[in-house]
Amino acid sequence: MIGFEIFLAIGMFTAIVLGLVAIILVARAKLVSSGDVTIQINGEHSLTVPAGGKLLQTLAANNVFLSSACGGGGTCAQCKCVVVDGGGEMLPTEESHFTRRQAKEGWRLSCQTPVKQDMQIRVPEEVFGVKKWECTVESNPNVATFIKELTLRLPDGESVDFRAGGYVQLECPPHVVEYKDFDIQPEYRGDWDKFNMWRYVSKVDETVIRAYSMANYPEEKGVVKFNIRIASPPPGSDLPPGQMSSWVFNLKPGDKVTVYGPFGEFFAKDTEAEMVFIGGGAGMAPMRSHIFDQLRRLRSTRKISFWYGARSLREAFYTEEYDQLQAENPNFQWHLALSDPQPEDNWTGLTGFIHNVLFENYLKDHPAPEDCEFYMCGPPMMNAAVIKMLTDLGVERENILLDDFGG
Protein backbone atom coordinates (compact mmCIF):
# COMPACT_ATOMS: atom_id res chain seq x y z
CA MET A 1 0.00 0.00 0.00
CA ILE A 2 2.79 2.35 0.95
CA GLY A 3 4.53 1.56 -2.35
CA PHE A 4 1.39 2.43 -4.26
CA GLU A 5 1.11 5.79 -2.48
CA ILE A 6 4.73 6.59 -3.27
CA PHE A 7 4.20 5.64 -6.90
CA LEU A 8 1.03 7.76 -7.03
CA ALA A 9 2.82 10.75 -5.47
CA ILE A 10 5.69 10.46 -7.94
CA GLY A 11 3.22 10.21 -10.80
CA MET A 12 1.28 13.26 -9.66
CA PHE A 13 4.49 15.28 -9.16
CA THR A 14 5.69 14.29 -12.62
CA ALA A 15 2.33 15.25 -14.14
CA ILE A 16 2.44 18.66 -12.42
CA VAL A 17 5.99 19.30 -13.65
CA LEU A 18 5.09 18.27 -17.19
CA GLY A 19 2.01 20.48 -17.05
CA LEU A 20 4.07 23.48 -15.93
CA VAL A 21 6.62 22.82 -18.67
CA ALA A 22 3.82 22.69 -21.23
CA ILE A 23 2.41 26.00 -19.96
CA ILE A 24 5.86 27.62 -20.13
CA LEU A 25 6.42 26.35 -23.65
CA VAL A 26 3.04 27.64 -24.80
CA ALA A 27 3.67 31.02 -23.16
CA ARG A 28 7.15 31.19 -24.64
CA ALA A 29 5.78 30.45 -28.09
CA LYS A 30 3.34 33.33 -27.71
CA LEU A 31 5.63 35.86 -26.01
CA VAL A 32 9.05 35.14 -27.49
CA SER A 33 9.30 35.41 -31.22
CA SER A 34 11.33 32.93 -33.21
CA GLY A 35 11.97 32.17 -36.83
CA ASP A 36 12.43 34.76 -39.58
CA VAL A 37 10.37 37.85 -40.32
CA THR A 38 10.42 40.38 -43.16
CA ILE A 39 11.07 44.11 -42.72
CA GLN A 40 9.94 46.33 -45.60
CA ILE A 41 11.81 49.66 -45.66
CA ASN A 42 10.37 52.69 -47.48
CA GLY A 43 8.41 50.33 -49.71
CA GLU A 44 11.55 49.64 -51.73
CA HIS A 45 13.95 47.56 -49.62
CA SER A 46 13.26 44.24 -47.95
CA LEU A 47 15.16 42.38 -45.23
CA THR A 48 14.60 38.85 -43.98
CA VAL A 49 15.85 38.75 -40.39
CA PRO A 50 15.58 36.61 -37.26
CA ALA A 51 12.82 37.67 -34.89
CA GLY A 52 13.50 38.52 -31.28
CA GLY A 53 15.84 41.52 -31.34
CA LYS A 54 15.36 45.26 -31.27
CA LEU A 55 14.80 47.09 -34.55
CA LEU A 56 17.91 49.32 -34.23
CA GLN A 57 20.33 46.43 -33.77
CA THR A 58 18.52 44.27 -36.34
CA LEU A 59 18.87 46.98 -38.99
CA ALA A 60 22.53 47.58 -38.10
CA ALA A 61 23.27 43.87 -38.47
CA ASN A 62 22.03 44.25 -42.05
CA ASN A 63 24.08 47.42 -42.77
CA VAL A 64 21.19 49.84 -42.31
CA PHE A 65 22.54 52.26 -39.71
CA LEU A 66 20.24 54.64 -37.88
CA SER A 67 21.86 57.29 -35.72
CA SER A 68 21.99 56.49 -32.01
CA ALA A 69 24.01 58.90 -29.92
CA CYS A 70 23.18 57.02 -26.70
CA GLY A 71 24.02 53.62 -28.18
CA GLY A 72 20.48 52.28 -27.94
CA GLY A 73 19.70 53.42 -24.42
CA GLY A 74 16.44 55.11 -25.35
CA THR A 75 17.53 58.59 -24.25
CA CYS A 76 18.80 60.50 -27.31
CA ALA A 77 15.80 59.85 -29.63
CA GLN A 78 18.11 59.96 -32.66
CA CYS A 79 17.08 56.48 -33.84
CA LYS A 80 13.47 57.42 -34.52
CA CYS A 81 11.64 56.01 -37.51
CA VAL A 82 8.05 55.47 -38.62
CA VAL A 83 6.63 52.00 -38.05
CA VAL A 84 3.77 51.67 -40.50
CA ASP A 85 2.84 48.13 -39.47
CA GLY A 86 4.01 45.40 -37.13
CA GLY A 87 5.71 47.25 -34.26
CA GLY A 88 3.20 46.68 -31.50
CA GLU A 89 2.24 49.35 -28.98
CA MET A 90 4.53 52.26 -28.11
CA LEU A 91 6.44 51.59 -24.89
CA PRO A 92 6.43 53.97 -21.90
CA THR A 93 10.16 54.59 -22.49
CA GLU A 94 9.28 56.13 -25.87
CA GLU A 95 6.28 58.28 -24.99
CA SER A 96 8.17 61.34 -23.74
CA HIS A 97 10.03 61.68 -27.04
CA PHE A 98 6.98 62.14 -29.26
CA THR A 99 3.92 64.35 -29.50
CA ARG A 100 0.48 62.77 -29.68
CA ARG A 101 0.39 63.54 -33.38
CA GLN A 102 3.73 61.83 -33.97
CA ALA A 103 2.58 58.81 -31.98
CA LYS A 104 -0.53 58.54 -34.18
CA GLU A 105 1.69 58.77 -37.27
CA GLY A 106 3.66 55.74 -36.07
CA TRP A 107 6.89 57.34 -34.89
CA ARG A 108 8.96 55.01 -32.70
CA LEU A 109 12.42 54.69 -31.22
CA SER A 110 13.99 51.83 -33.13
CA CYS A 111 16.16 50.92 -30.12
CA GLN A 112 12.98 50.22 -28.12
CA THR A 113 10.89 48.58 -30.85
CA PRO A 114 10.91 44.76 -30.78
CA VAL A 115 11.09 42.73 -33.98
CA LYS A 116 8.39 40.11 -33.43
CA GLN A 117 6.57 39.91 -36.75
CA ASP A 118 6.64 41.18 -40.33
CA MET A 119 7.08 44.95 -40.31
CA GLN A 120 6.81 47.96 -42.60
CA ILE A 121 8.92 50.98 -41.66
CA ARG A 122 10.03 54.33 -43.08
CA VAL A 123 13.49 55.81 -42.53
CA PRO A 124 15.26 58.86 -44.04
CA GLU A 125 16.70 58.07 -47.48
CA GLU A 126 20.14 59.30 -46.43
CA VAL A 127 20.38 56.33 -44.08
CA PHE A 128 21.27 54.21 -47.10
CA GLY A 129 24.41 56.32 -47.55
CA VAL A 130 25.69 55.42 -44.09
CA LYS A 131 28.72 53.11 -44.11
CA LYS A 132 30.88 51.20 -41.65
CA TRP A 133 34.69 51.29 -41.56
CA GLU A 134 37.46 49.79 -39.49
CA CYS A 135 39.83 52.73 -39.03
CA THR A 136 43.34 52.93 -37.62
CA VAL A 137 44.43 55.37 -34.92
CA GLU A 138 46.90 57.79 -36.51
CA SER A 139 47.41 60.01 -33.47
CA ASN A 140 45.76 60.74 -30.13
CA PRO A 141 47.51 63.59 -28.28
CA ASN A 142 46.09 65.90 -25.65
CA VAL A 143 45.21 69.33 -26.99
CA ALA A 144 43.93 70.48 -23.59
CA THR A 145 44.12 69.06 -20.07
CA PHE A 146 41.08 66.83 -20.45
CA ILE A 147 40.62 66.82 -24.25
CA LYS A 148 42.23 64.50 -26.80
CA GLU A 149 42.45 65.10 -30.54
CA LEU A 150 41.77 61.64 -31.95
CA THR A 151 42.68 61.23 -35.62
CA LEU A 152 41.59 58.02 -37.37
CA ARG A 153 42.91 56.93 -40.76
CA LEU A 154 40.30 55.40 -43.07
CA PRO A 155 41.08 52.26 -45.10
CA ASP A 156 42.95 52.97 -48.33
CA GLY A 157 40.71 54.43 -51.01
CA GLU A 158 37.84 55.10 -48.61
CA SER A 159 36.33 58.48 -47.72
CA VAL A 160 33.47 59.80 -45.60
CA ASP A 161 31.01 61.74 -47.74
CA PHE A 162 29.92 64.20 -45.06
CA ARG A 163 28.85 67.81 -44.66
CA ALA A 164 30.59 70.20 -42.29
CA GLY A 165 29.00 69.93 -38.87
CA GLY A 166 28.23 66.23 -39.32
CA TYR A 167 29.05 63.40 -36.97
CA VAL A 168 29.82 59.71 -36.92
CA GLN A 169 29.42 56.97 -34.33
CA LEU A 170 32.33 55.17 -32.71
CA GLU A 171 32.06 51.61 -31.44
CA CYS A 172 33.78 50.75 -28.18
CA PRO A 173 34.30 47.04 -27.38
CA PRO A 174 34.12 45.50 -23.89
CA HIS A 175 37.24 46.50 -21.99
CA VAL A 176 39.04 47.18 -18.75
CA VAL A 177 40.96 50.47 -18.90
CA GLU A 178 43.08 51.89 -16.08
CA TYR A 179 43.62 55.64 -16.11
CA LYS A 180 47.18 55.17 -14.84
CA ASP A 181 48.01 53.74 -18.28
CA PHE A 182 46.94 56.90 -20.17
CA ASP A 183 49.53 58.76 -22.20
CA ILE A 184 49.13 62.33 -20.95
CA GLN A 185 51.72 64.90 -22.03
CA PRO A 186 53.78 66.45 -19.19
CA GLU A 187 52.28 69.95 -19.56
CA TYR A 188 48.81 68.57 -18.77
CA ARG A 189 49.65 66.19 -15.93
CA GLY A 190 49.41 68.77 -13.14
CA ASP A 191 45.62 68.75 -12.94
CA TRP A 192 45.55 64.98 -13.40
CA ASP A 193 47.74 64.73 -10.29
CA LYS A 194 45.74 67.41 -8.45
CA PHE A 195 42.43 65.59 -8.93
CA ASN A 196 44.00 62.11 -8.63
CA MET A 197 42.54 61.11 -11.97
CA TRP A 198 44.89 58.13 -12.14
CA ARG A 199 42.78 56.16 -9.65
CA TYR A 200 39.89 55.53 -12.01
CA VAL A 201 39.23 52.27 -13.82
CA SER A 202 36.69 51.78 -16.61
CA LYS A 203 35.13 48.31 -16.81
CA VAL A 204 32.70 47.72 -19.67
CA ASP A 205 31.11 44.33 -20.34
CA GLU A 206 29.30 45.07 -23.60
CA THR A 207 29.78 47.02 -26.80
CA VAL A 208 29.08 50.75 -26.46
CA ILE A 209 28.29 53.19 -29.30
CA ARG A 210 28.58 56.97 -29.02
CA ALA A 211 28.26 59.86 -31.47
CA TYR A 212 31.00 62.46 -31.97
CA SER A 213 31.08 65.53 -34.18
CA MET A 214 33.96 65.66 -36.63
CA ALA A 215 36.59 68.38 -36.32
CA ASN A 216 37.85 67.99 -39.89
CA TYR A 217 36.08 69.47 -42.90
CA PRO A 218 35.17 67.63 -46.13
CA GLU A 219 38.38 68.46 -48.01
CA GLU A 220 40.55 66.94 -45.27
CA LYS A 221 40.20 63.51 -46.82
CA GLY A 222 41.30 60.09 -45.69
CA VAL A 223 40.85 60.81 -42.00
CA VAL A 224 38.24 61.62 -39.41
CA LYS A 225 39.25 63.86 -36.52
CA PHE A 226 37.59 64.42 -33.13
CA ASN A 227 37.98 66.50 -29.98
CA ILE A 228 36.93 64.21 -27.14
CA ARG A 229 36.74 65.22 -23.49
CA ILE A 230 37.23 62.67 -20.73
CA ALA A 231 33.98 62.11 -18.82
CA SER A 232 35.29 61.72 -15.28
CA PRO A 233 32.91 61.26 -12.32
CA PRO A 234 31.83 64.39 -10.41
CA PRO A 235 33.90 64.98 -7.24
CA GLY A 236 32.63 62.97 -4.29
CA SER A 237 30.42 60.67 -6.36
CA ASP A 238 30.52 56.91 -6.75
CA LEU A 239 29.62 57.07 -10.43
CA PRO A 240 31.85 55.20 -12.90
CA PRO A 241 33.92 57.14 -15.45
CA GLY A 242 32.66 57.60 -18.99
CA GLN A 243 32.76 54.33 -20.89
CA MET A 244 33.60 55.60 -24.37
CA SER A 245 35.82 58.53 -23.40
CA SER A 246 37.90 56.32 -21.09
CA TRP A 247 38.48 53.88 -23.92
CA VAL A 248 39.32 56.69 -26.36
CA PHE A 249 41.87 58.20 -23.97
CA ASN A 250 43.67 54.85 -23.86
CA LEU A 251 43.92 54.46 -27.66
CA LYS A 252 47.41 54.32 -29.16
CA PRO A 253 48.60 54.74 -32.77
CA GLY A 254 47.88 51.55 -34.69
CA ASP A 255 44.80 50.59 -32.66
CA LYS A 256 41.61 49.80 -34.59
CA VAL A 257 38.32 51.68 -34.20
CA THR A 258 34.98 50.87 -35.85
CA VAL A 259 33.22 53.93 -37.27
CA TYR A 260 29.67 54.34 -38.65
CA GLY A 261 28.42 57.34 -40.57
CA PRO A 262 27.99 59.97 -41.63
CA PHE A 263 25.02 61.49 -39.84
CA GLY A 264 24.06 65.04 -39.09
CA GLU A 265 21.61 67.89 -38.75
CA PHE A 266 23.91 70.71 -37.58
CA PHE A 267 24.50 72.11 -41.05
CA ALA A 268 25.11 75.68 -42.20
CA LYS A 269 22.23 77.48 -43.85
CA ASP A 270 22.73 78.43 -47.49
CA THR A 271 22.17 82.17 -47.07
CA GLU A 272 24.22 85.36 -47.10
CA ALA A 273 23.48 86.16 -43.45
CA GLU A 274 26.29 86.92 -41.01
CA MET A 275 27.54 83.80 -39.20
CA VAL A 276 28.50 83.92 -35.52
CA PHE A 277 30.12 80.78 -34.09
CA ILE A 278 30.29 80.27 -30.31
CA GLY A 279 32.19 77.40 -28.72
CA GLY A 280 33.76 76.04 -25.57
CA GLY A 281 35.60 72.88 -24.53
CA ALA A 282 35.30 69.94 -26.92
CA GLY A 283 32.61 71.94 -28.71
CA MET A 284 35.54 73.17 -30.78
CA ALA A 285 35.11 70.18 -33.13
CA PRO A 286 32.07 71.22 -35.21
CA MET A 287 33.17 74.87 -35.03
CA ARG A 288 36.44 74.01 -36.76
CA SER A 289 34.65 71.86 -39.34
CA HIS A 290 32.20 74.65 -40.21
CA ILE A 291 34.64 77.55 -40.24
CA PHE A 292 37.28 75.77 -42.31
CA ASP A 293 34.60 74.59 -44.73
CA GLN A 294 33.26 78.11 -45.20
CA LEU A 295 36.66 79.73 -45.69
CA ARG A 296 38.82 77.02 -47.26
CA ARG A 297 36.39 75.00 -49.38
CA LEU A 298 33.50 77.34 -50.15
CA ARG A 299 35.62 80.53 -50.17
CA SER A 300 32.67 82.23 -48.50
CA THR A 301 32.50 86.03 -48.45
CA ARG A 302 29.93 86.05 -45.66
CA LYS A 303 30.85 87.96 -42.52
CA ILE A 304 32.02 85.31 -40.03
CA SER A 305 33.21 85.56 -36.44
CA PHE A 306 34.19 82.90 -33.91
CA TRP A 307 34.02 83.36 -30.15
CA TYR A 308 35.68 80.62 -28.09
CA GLY A 309 35.85 80.36 -24.31
CA ALA A 310 38.58 78.51 -22.41
CA ARG A 311 39.69 78.49 -18.79
CA SER A 312 43.34 79.36 -19.52
CA LEU A 313 45.77 79.36 -22.43
CA ARG A 314 46.61 75.73 -21.72
CA GLU A 315 42.99 74.85 -22.54
CA ALA A 316 42.94 76.74 -25.86
CA PHE A 317 43.87 74.88 -29.04
CA TYR A 318 43.99 75.41 -32.82
CA THR A 319 44.86 79.03 -32.03
CA GLU A 320 47.56 79.25 -34.71
CA GLU A 321 45.18 77.84 -37.32
CA TYR A 322 42.57 80.49 -36.54
CA ASP A 323 45.21 83.22 -36.53
CA GLN A 324 46.18 82.12 -40.03
CA LEU A 325 42.56 82.00 -41.22
CA GLN A 326 42.01 85.51 -39.89
CA ALA A 327 45.12 86.79 -41.69
CA GLU A 328 43.99 85.20 -44.96
CA ASN A 329 40.30 86.19 -44.85
CA PRO A 330 39.25 89.81 -44.26
CA ASN A 331 35.66 88.65 -43.65
CA PHE A 332 36.69 86.49 -40.66
CA GLN A 333 37.60 87.42 -37.09
CA TRP A 334 38.08 85.19 -34.11
CA HIS A 335 38.16 85.98 -30.40
CA LEU A 336 39.52 83.92 -27.51
CA ALA A 337 38.27 84.68 -23.98
CA LEU A 338 39.80 83.16 -20.83
CA SER A 339 37.63 82.70 -17.75
CA ASP A 340 40.55 81.92 -15.40
CA PRO A 341 43.85 83.06 -16.95
CA GLN A 342 46.93 81.83 -15.13
CA PRO A 343 49.89 84.05 -14.17
CA GLU A 344 52.13 82.29 -16.68
CA ASP A 345 49.67 83.17 -19.46
CA ASN A 346 50.54 86.89 -19.26
CA TRP A 347 47.08 87.36 -20.75
CA THR A 348 46.00 90.82 -21.89
CA GLY A 349 43.08 89.69 -24.05
CA LEU A 350 39.39 89.14 -23.37
CA THR A 351 38.38 87.63 -20.02
CA GLY A 352 35.15 86.22 -18.63
CA PHE A 353 32.50 83.75 -19.72
CA ILE A 354 32.04 83.65 -23.46
CA HIS A 355 28.35 84.65 -23.52
CA ASN A 356 29.13 87.82 -21.56
CA VAL A 357 32.21 88.55 -23.66
CA LEU A 358 30.23 88.16 -26.88
CA PHE A 359 27.49 90.47 -25.64
CA GLU A 360 29.71 93.18 -24.15
CA ASN A 361 32.23 93.27 -26.99
CA TYR A 362 29.98 92.80 -29.99
CA LEU A 363 26.28 92.09 -29.81
CA LYS A 364 25.15 94.90 -27.51
CA ASP A 365 26.22 97.39 -30.20
CA HIS A 366 25.28 95.23 -33.19
CA PRO A 367 22.66 96.99 -35.35
CA ALA A 368 20.65 93.82 -36.04
CA PRO A 369 21.67 90.68 -34.11
CA GLU A 370 18.31 89.15 -35.05
CA ASP A 371 19.50 88.99 -38.66
CA CYS A 372 22.57 86.86 -37.82
CA GLU A 373 22.84 83.08 -37.75
CA PHE A 374 24.32 81.70 -34.53
CA TYR A 375 26.05 78.31 -34.46
CA MET A 376 27.12 76.97 -31.08
CA CYS A 377 28.57 73.93 -29.37
CA GLY A 378 29.96 73.72 -25.86
CA PRO A 379 29.23 72.70 -22.27
CA PRO A 380 25.52 72.67 -21.34
CA MET A 381 25.78 75.72 -19.08
CA MET A 382 27.42 77.71 -21.87
CA ASN A 383 24.76 76.67 -24.36
CA ALA A 384 21.94 77.65 -22.00
CA ALA A 385 23.52 81.03 -21.21
CA VAL A 386 24.09 81.86 -24.87
CA ILE A 387 20.57 80.85 -25.89
CA LYS A 388 19.05 83.02 -23.14
CA MET A 389 21.22 85.98 -24.12
CA LEU A 390 20.30 85.64 -27.80
CA THR A 391 16.61 85.20 -27.03
CA ASP A 392 16.68 88.35 -24.90
CA LEU A 393 18.17 90.16 -27.92
CA GLY A 394 15.23 89.10 -30.07
CA VAL A 395 16.96 86.39 -32.09
CA GLU A 396 14.45 83.85 -33.39
CA ARG A 397 15.03 80.23 -32.36
CA GLU A 398 15.36 79.19 -36.02
CA ASN A 399 18.55 81.28 -36.23
CA ILE A 400 20.11 79.62 -33.17
CA LEU A 401 21.66 76.32 -34.23
CA LEU A 402 22.99 74.02 -31.52
CA ASP A 403 25.13 70.89 -31.69
CA ASP A 404 24.51 68.87 -28.54
CA PHE A 405 27.18 66.24 -29.22
CA GLY A 406 30.44 68.11 -29.28
CA GLY A 407 30.52 69.63 -25.83
Swiss-Prot record:
Belongs to the NqrF family. Binds 1 [2Fe-2S] cluster. The gene is nqrF. It is found in: Cell inner membrane. [2Fe-2S] cluster binds at residues 70, 76, 79, 111. It is a single-pass membrane protein. GO terms for cellular component: plasma membrane. GO terms for biological process: sodium ion transport. One of its GO terms (molecular function) is 2 iron, 2 sulfur cluster binding. Keywords: 2Fe-2S, Cell inner membrane, Cell membrane, FAD, Flavoprotein, Ion transport, Iron, Iron-sulfur, Membrane, Metal-binding, NAD, Sodium, Sodium transport, Translocase, Transmembrane, Transmembrane helix, Transport, Ubiquinone. NQR complex catalyzes the reduction of ubiquinone-1 to ubiquinol by two successive reactions, coupled with the transport of Na(+) ions from the cytoplasm to the periplasm. The first step is catalyzed by NqrF, which accepts electrons from NADH and reduces ubiquinone-1 to ubisemiquinone by a one-electron transfer pathway. It comes from Pseudomonas paraeruginosa (strain DSM 24068 / PA7). This is Na(+)-translocating NADH-quinone reductase subunit F.
